[in-house]
């Protein structure tokens, strides 16, 4: 596929104006963020599929109408050495699909460090796979309450905006705390690559394309693009699309998907009002949560107060080689008993950043003989095993996984090949349909929820297929 601009449509939606083939291919640095990006495209009217392994011709043949292909990954919690080993092959396989934009999809809170989930390292690897001479970066996503102004990232919680280094959750992230909101400075710790900015004032100017062309060079600089509102969102999408040339690599949040969709919509290439169908209610759902977020903690508390059965996974026991299997058995038994009575269940490892399971996690891991990272993955595998056994023992049609690492572990254990969007719930956490060669898993309805997504009624909303109380 080349970089020529599709013909200007005459009126309404004009699908024939699209260039042939894929429009975008992306690798998500965690599973929940990958579904967020898929939702943004699908809701806008761009058929999208999310693969949970490298996309093969055989798998993609099941989705002949797609214009966007994603692959869910786990690099946000990985070392730079892991990235050096794993990302080149993955990104090469996505680049080979021929889309003009290859994206490394990052979280809209940009949580990363030189040691863990290095976005800079991912960029240095990714730019080798596309011919472009700049690497745009779109992080702001107003729909998710993320805003970038003059290179600084802000996020709103409960109607209050915070600079990211003062955000009540991200500034205290247990692995990658954000202590710098200026993304130029934060990213400069992770790469020696030149970093530039198109700020919100330049973006609205008449000569912004000239400015981009002046920045383009063989060293392929990273160019951050401010996004504050719907106007700057659409302008960012226009800039990326019109300056894609023969193909570009970008490390961006789902703000990129929202930006491209806004531009395409403005040109009449997409329906004027983005939407997804609603879902039907189910009697009961099962959820597992490895999230430490106060947002998820509030959601667990709401669910408990509204008739859900909540069961804590005891981490010292779960990590102990002698007690781990028994702890999983205990949790599964309690959860199964509730589900057979038609009661929804949440199995969780923590409730918020001040939970002793979080504040004392290093000591718990050390006592079990694990480094922090290895212990965290073992907890994710324990939650995945709980979900697998619940699905094998109870008739369940809809499940939830909260937390990016947990989502990856669960999807792997369940043998899911791909996901597509079934229905809309809240921005960033759609209801998905699982595609699997395993008949018992094919058609499973699943929600993968990031820690910061949703209000307190989230689990009730998933069960009802709509906002609780609506």
From Swiss-Prot:
Substrate binds at residues 30, 78. Its EC number is 2.7.1.231. The keyword Signal does not apply. Pathway: Carbohydrate metabolism. The keyword Plastid does not apply. It catalyses: 3-oxoisoapionate + ATP = 3-oxoisoapionate 4-phosphate + ADP + H(+). InterPro entries: 4-carb_acid_sugar_kinase_N, 4-carb_acid_sugar_kinase_N_sf, NBD_C, NBD_C_sf, OiaK. ATP binds at residues 291, 403-406, 451. Signal peptide: none annotated. Belongs to the four-carbon acid sugar kinase family. Involved in catabolism of D-apiose. Catalyzes the phosphorylation of 3-oxo-isoapionate to 3-oxo-isoapionate 4-phosphate. This is 3-oxo-isoapionate kinase. It comes from Paraburkholderia graminis (strain ATCC 700544 / DSM 17151 / LMG 18924 / NCIMB 13744 / C4D1M).
């Amino acid at each position: 596929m080349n970089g020529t601009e599709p013909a200007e449509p005459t009126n309404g939606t004009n699908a024939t104006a699209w260039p042939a083939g894929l429009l975008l291919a992306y690798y998500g640095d965690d599973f929940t963020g990958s579904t967020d990006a898929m939702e943004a495209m699908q809701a806008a009217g761009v058929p999208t599929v999310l693969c949970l392994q490298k996309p093969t011709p055989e798998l993609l043949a099941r989705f002949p109408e797609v214009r966007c292909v994603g692959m869910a990954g786990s690099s946000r919690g990985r070392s730079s050495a892991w990235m050096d080993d794993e990302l080149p092959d993955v990104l090469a396989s996505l680049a080979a699909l021929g889309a003009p934009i290859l994206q490394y999809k990052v979280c809209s809170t940009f949580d990363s460090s030189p040691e863990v989930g290095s976005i800079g390292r991912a960029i240095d690897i990714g730019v080798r796979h596309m011919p472009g001479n700049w690497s745009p970066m779109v992080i702001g996503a107003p729909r998710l309450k993320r805003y970038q102004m003059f290179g600084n990232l802000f996020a709103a919680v409960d109607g209050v905006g915070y600079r990211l280094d003062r955000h009540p959750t991200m500034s205290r992230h247990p692995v990658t705390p954000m202590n710098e909101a200026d993304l130029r400075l934060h990213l400069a710790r992770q790469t020696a690559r030149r970093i530039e900015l198109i700020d919100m004032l330049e973006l609205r100017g008449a000569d912004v394309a000239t400015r981009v062309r002046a920045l383009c060079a063989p060293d392929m600089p990273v160019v951050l693009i401010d996004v504050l509102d719907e106007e700057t969102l659409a302008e960012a999408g226009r800039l990326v699309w019109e300056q894609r040339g023969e193909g570009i690599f970008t490390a961006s949040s789902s703000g990129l998907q929202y930006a491209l969709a806004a531009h395409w919509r403005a040109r009449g290439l997409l329906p004027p009002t983005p939407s997804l169908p609603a879902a039907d209610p189910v009697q009961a759902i099962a959820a597992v949560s490895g999230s430490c977020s106060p947002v998820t903690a509030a959601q667990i508390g709401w669910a408990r107060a509204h008739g859900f059965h909540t069961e804590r996974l005891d981490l010292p026991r779960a990590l102990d080689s002698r007690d781990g299997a028994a702890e999983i058995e205990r949790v599964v038994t309690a959860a199964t008993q509730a589900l057979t009575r038609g009661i929804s269940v949440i199995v969780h490892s923590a409730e918020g950043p001040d939970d002793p399971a979080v504040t004392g996690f290093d000591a718990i891991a050390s006592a079990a003989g694990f480094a922090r990272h290895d212990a965290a993955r073992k907890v994710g595998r324990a939650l995945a095993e709980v979900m697998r056994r619940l699905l094998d023992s109870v008739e369940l049609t809809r499940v939830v996984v909260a937390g990016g690492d947990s989502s990856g572990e669960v999807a792997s254990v369940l043998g899911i090949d791909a996901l597509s969007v079934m229905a809309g719930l809240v921005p960033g956490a759609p209801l998905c349909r699982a595609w699997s060669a395993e008949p018992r898993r094919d058609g499973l309805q699943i929600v993968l929820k990031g820690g910061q997504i949703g209000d307190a009624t989230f689990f009730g909303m998933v069960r009802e297929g709509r906002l609780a109380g609506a």
